[in-house]
């Protein structure tokens, strides 16, 4: 009697099964990675720089964290797809105080341990998973120390990762431990207990103003921006040399006569019940702006008396309006990036000869930040046809 053979899978079939399993694990591991973004849309004739910032309605339980990627490439920030819950926003509009989970009490101490009160404090909006960009900022334009004789200090502003209070611990639920270790290593992490979402940047704004007023009362100037910007700190300090930190100043890429978006299909839709005026007050694009210590302290008080608004940079413009202050436009702050001129479609905009004449450029990856830093600060420096000082006047395209 002939024995029946067992069926065997050929090597190609085994390889296919293994690859399918690996792909499934990869997709499962990346399914929940999410982080807010503050990158603005393209500038239009009547559109504001939208940076929606909706407040959290619950204090997240940070003891039970959802899975969070902390390794590999920088996560791509998603845009919101769900409708803006204005009813929930209005019901929770008075909830604006959240505990500080990680602090840097000695960041601006003048006891000699940290070098005294800083001339420039750099505050960068970040999210827990974005270690790659934080490290790029630390090692390039955001490095602490003396720059042209000015003392520069740095902090990153974070909230609790989205979904951290919804339960479901996983293999990547160690975000709090990692942030605490990062804080011990660099002493530059500020973490609050509100959920860090696309809509919560206004909370980050008011909590930072309150923190800086309490822990950095003698700071001369503050630069506040996103983690995907490149800042030419020497140009910024050159601009600030002639400014008095005791006088009011808030300078950046200023947007005026921006109209609220009334189209319900837009993710930046603002109903008339929330804002009924035809235009927003003048405001500086949230990608990066600089303010004096005097203005910071006044803003901290004014913003505590202004109802929160779901667009953080517009909200800051409302606080300035309450103080009867006007933001100062500066052409070297490019929070919408460097536009490609229509007359020169082949012109390379990612060029150190352009960046050396600017203060802020928004919309760079971590790799681009590293590369531009090396191009500008390498041993040879940028080779440009017309070297000239920067941050002293309007930016012009060289022919």
UniProtKB/Swiss-Prot annotation:
GO terms for biological process: protein glycosylation. Keywords: Glycosyltransferase, Golgi apparatus, Membrane, Signal-anchor, Transferase, Transmembrane, Transmembrane helix. It comes from Mus musculus. GO terms for cellular component: Golgi membrane. Residues 38-51 have a biased composition (Pro residues). Belongs to the glycosyltransferase 31 family. Pfam families: Galactosyl_T (PF01762). GO terms for molecular function: hexosyltransferase activity. Its EC number is 2.4.1.-. It comes from the Eukaryota. The lineage of its organism: Eukaryota, Metazoa, Chordata, Craniata, Vertebrata. This is UDP-GlcNAc:betaGal beta-1,3-N-acetylglucosaminyltransferase 9.
């Amino acid at each position: 009697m002939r024995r029946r053979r067992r069926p065997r899978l050929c090597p190609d079939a085994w390889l296919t099964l293994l690859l399918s399993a690996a792909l499934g694990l990869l997709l499962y591991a990346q399914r929940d990675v999410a982080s807010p973004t503050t990158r603005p849309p393209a500038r239009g004739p009547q559109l504001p720089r939208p940076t929606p910032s909706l407040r959290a309605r619950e204090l997240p339980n940070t003891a039970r964290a959802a899975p969070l990627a902390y390794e590999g490439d920088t996560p791509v920030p998603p845009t919101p797809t769900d409708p803006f819950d204005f009813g929930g926003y209005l019901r929770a509009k008075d909830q604006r105080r959240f505990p500080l989970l990680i602090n840097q009490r000695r960041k601006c101490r003048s006891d000699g341990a940290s070098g005294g009160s800083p001339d420039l404090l750099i505050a960068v909006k970040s999210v827990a998973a974005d270690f790659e960009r934080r490290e790029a900022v630390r090692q390039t334009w955001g490095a602490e120390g003396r720059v042209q004789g000015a003392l520069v200090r740095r902090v990153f502003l974070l909230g609790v990762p989205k979904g951290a209070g919804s339960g479901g611990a996983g293999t990547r639920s160690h975000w709090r431990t990692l942030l605490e270790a990062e804080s011990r290593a660099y002493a530059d992490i500020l973490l609050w207990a509100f959920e860090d979402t696309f809509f919560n940047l206004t909370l980050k704004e008011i909590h930072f103003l309150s923190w800086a007023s309490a822990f950095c009362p003698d700071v001369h100037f503050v630069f506040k921006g996103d983690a995907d910007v490149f800042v030419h700190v020497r140009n910024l300090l050159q601009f600030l040399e002639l400014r008095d930190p005791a006088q009011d100043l808030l300078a950046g890429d200023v947007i005026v006569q921006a109209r609220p978006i009334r189209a319900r299909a837009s993710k930046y839709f603002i109903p008339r019940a929330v804002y009924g005026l035809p235009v927003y007050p003048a405001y500086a694009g949230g990608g990066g702006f600089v303010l004096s210590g005097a203005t910071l302290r006044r803003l901290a008080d004014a913003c505590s008396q202004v109802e929160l608004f779901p667009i953080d940079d517009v909200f800051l413009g409302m606080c300035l309006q309450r103080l009867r202050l006007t933001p100062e436009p500066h052409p070297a702050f490019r929070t919408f990036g460097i536009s490609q001129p229509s007359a020169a479609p082949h012109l390379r905009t990612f060029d150190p000869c352009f960046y050396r004449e600017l203060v802020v450029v928004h919309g760079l990856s971590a790799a681009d930040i590293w590369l531009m830093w090396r191009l500008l600060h390498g041993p040879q420096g940028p080779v440009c046809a017309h070297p000239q000082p920067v941050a002293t006047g309007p930016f012009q395209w060289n022919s």
